[in-house]
């Protein structure tokens, strides 16, 4: 299918209904049928179960349990770096934020204000800073970890579309990551503020965080804003902060004052792993 037809199909699909149905099916505990579906998925996408804490497909009571599986201890060691990669995936885009514009794909960008749900004051903290967008494919590990230590200040649920977030739609749907449903997490770190955005997509049944649990569903159709200034929720570098139940994309924002320099091996479409060096301060 051509890119144009693939993108057109995304506009025509009943994405909300499809996602709701698939979310319910992914939670179903259907015994041997669930195991058969998991085995088929592993074969179809080449999932490396040797890295899973439990490598037996029959050990997972539901597809969601399999999809959010834990890794064996030690298979993703943390690099000695100011920022480490928070997920397994592939780089969609990385680079400088131009004013408040974030590059999505050739001919497409979107504003930091739109990404965080319309809060211009929050977005301004990242003017001329840096961003990283990482796509998680179906075969990847789908828990999200902290790129650096941070204290949680705020979480914003932003309702939106449920377009697929694969490379084809990233090239073809304007403002994709600022249009899709998303969960915006705001942290204070030793390097200044940091935003970590979990972006939903077609068939992504839900997104959750370690401090809140499942954020969606429900899908109330309005922005929800949680503040944590009166709580001491501190997560260390490499510590789990959230997960996707069926995969998607993570977008990170860093302020100009952080002096961030990306790993020179990080380029468009390059595969990345949790714990690898993502960036250092004023380093090549």
Swiss-Prot record:
Sites bearing Pyruvic acid (Ser), chain numbering: 248
Root EC class: lyase
Cofactor(s) the record lists: pyruvate
GO biological process: phosphatidylethanolamine biosynthetic process
Pathway as given in its UniProt record: Phospholipid metabolism; phosphatidylethanolamine biosynthesis; phosphatidylethanolamine from CDP-diacylglycerol: step 2/2
Gene Ontology molecular-function annotations: phosphatidylserine decarboxylase activity
Membrane topology summary: Peripheral membrane protein
Chief location bin: membrane
Keywords for the protein's UniProt record, in alphabetical order: Cell membrane, Decarboxylase, Lipid biosynthesis, Lipid metabolism, Lyase, Membrane, Phospholipid biosynthesis, Phospholipid metabolism, Pyruvate, Zymogen
Location within or outside the cell: Cell membrane
InterPro entries in alphabetical order: PS_Dcarbxylase (IPR003817), PSD-B (IPR033177), PSD_type1_pro (IPR033178)
Catalytic activity reported: a 1,2-diacyl-sn-glycero-3-phospho-L-serine + H(+) = a 1,2-diacyl-sn-glycero-3-phosphoethanolamine + CO2
Entry EC no(s): 4.1.1.65
Site (Cleavage (non-hydrolytic)): 247-248
Record's cofactor remark: Binds 1 pyruvoyl group covalently per subunit.
Annotated active site: 88 (charge relay system), 145 (charge relay system), 248 (charge relay system), 248 (schiff-base intermediate with substrate)
A GO cellular-component term linked to this record: plasma membrane
PTM statement from Swiss-Prot or TrEMBL: Is synthesized initially as an inactive proenzyme. Formation of the active enzyme involves a self-maturation process in which the active site pyruvoyl group is generated from an internal serine residue via an autocatalytic post-translational modification. Two non-identical subunits are generated from the proenzyme in this reaction, and the pyruvate is formed at the N-terminus of the alpha chain, which is derived from the carboxyl end of the proenzyme.
Known role: Catalyzes the formation of phosphatidylethanolamine (PtdEtn) from phosphatidylserine (PtdSer).
PANTHER family, sorted: PHOSPHATIDYLSERINE DECARBOXYLASE, PHOSPHATIDYLSERINE DECARBOXYLASE PROENZYME, MITOCHONDRIAL
Family: Belongs to the phosphatidylserine decarboxylase family. PSD-B subfamily. Prokaryotic type I sub-subfamily.
Assembly notes: Heterodimer of a large membrane-associated beta subunit and a small pyruvoyl-containing alpha subunit.
Name of the protein in question: Phosphatidylserine decarboxylase proenzyme
UniProt organism field: Delftia acidovorans (strain DSM 14801 / SPH-1)
Gene for this chain: psd
